């Protein structure tokens, strides 16, 4: 997926995941402890690569080049065994139990001047973890452009105007967080025209892109968009 983003508008293309529109000098790759990706992404162009202590285990099992990790964060309740001695200089101990490992990793990434993060391992498994990750992303959405990837879709908090390209035939879901008002769409099989979505009444899941380009605009609230990969 390609990202060309500004403060209030974002253009995303499904064709080329490497051409993101954001200088890679400002972009991080983060692995957290959800369901591991079946295929690891290419890493050479990221400014920073990091993982939680739990994700370290599946990266090792998948023969990920661990020397590329800039830091490993967490409370280290997942013991790393002999690897502790090898990679101890990259450990960042974050014992605060009031924050998730994902939240603490985002704090470190933001402190180091990064503006965008691609996240793998954010979904699947225990659903409370997924909801916690989504909430952490919400807290950082004005500071970091966070995009999640899993086996089925990519998802993110959308700006007020979002343009999706090369998406014809793909499932597009609009999820209010928790209320999104004045939504207007173009290029969806079931369009919205200045309508609202409310988590307690109506959500916009499982829509379908009827055109190659889909435009989503909304007024008040926050909106999570899921795009089928």
Model regions and ranges:
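N-terminal beta-strand-loop-alpha-helix module at the start
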Residues: 16-83
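Short phosphate-binding loop-to-helix
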Residues: 90-111
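N-terminal glycine-rich phosphate/adenylate-binding segment common to multiple enzyme folds
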Residues: 114-128
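Short Gly/Thr/Asp-enriched flexible loops that form oxyanion-binding sites at enzyme active sites
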Residues: 127-138
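Class I SAM-dependent methyltransferase SAM-binding "motif I" and its flanking Rossmann-like core
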Residues: 136-167, 172
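Long, charged alpha-helical interface segments
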Residues: 158-229
